[in-house]
Amino acid sequence: SIVYDGKVRIVDPYLVGINKKGNEALRAYQVGGYSSSGNLPAWRLYLLKNINSVEILDTSFKIHPQYNPNDKGMARISCRVETA
């Protein structure tokens, strides 16, 4: 889970890198917690500078069928979940 802009969000992290605007970012699939839109689950792009804390939960997740390891929203990918 992450605390983003002061609110807890439960996410499955997939990619970390630099987005198209030049910001360090996390691409994740949000499955719970706060959502201003209320539309969950959903893919989200989180700016690392706005993540206040991270907690590793005792859970796992299956690779989402829409996961793209070559995410077009990222200019450079530093770390990614690998598919089998």
How does the language model describe each region?
Residues 1-84:
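Core beta-strand-centered patch of the WYL/Sm-like small regulatory domain
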